[in-house]
Amino acid sequence: ISDDRGINIVLNRAYPINQGAFLSTGGRSDSAIFFSVILEYIAFGFALDEAVAQAVRQLRQADPKSSYNCMIQSQDQLVALCAAGREKTSPRIVEIYDEYGKGEKAHDYRVMRYRDVQDRDGKPSGVVVASSGFEQNESDGWKVLKNDQMIVASNRTGECHVRSI
């Protein structure tokens, strides 16, 4: 999570975070800051999916071009979020992929896909969510999770739905 000057939020001492929530994550990264903001919204009484949406809205006020893609799970829900600040893969990412001989895959950098899972009777029983790294063909049931959308799945029933942030 970085601002327009490329300064990571971890180095931005002026960004107002709840130190208690941040320290409870055990981390010192931008992901720990993101998670601590989510924890604050949960403490305010929001359900996990809405806490994630609120956290992205808040963080985007300072860092609108950052990517907030994540997967987070509670006892009741799995939330998988696609929230990239840029639609196009940055030249630096393409450069890095090229260095490893994988330049043709750079277009897939921020893409998230999901596939519904059914039980033996054909009833919905869950969802698989994945990022890049292996083939996820539409012919195999994979669907693109659009930018600024999240999958919200019940850990108890496997039922899921897509919602916007």
Locate each region found by the language model.
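N-terminal segments that mediate ammonia production and transfer
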Residues: S2-I165
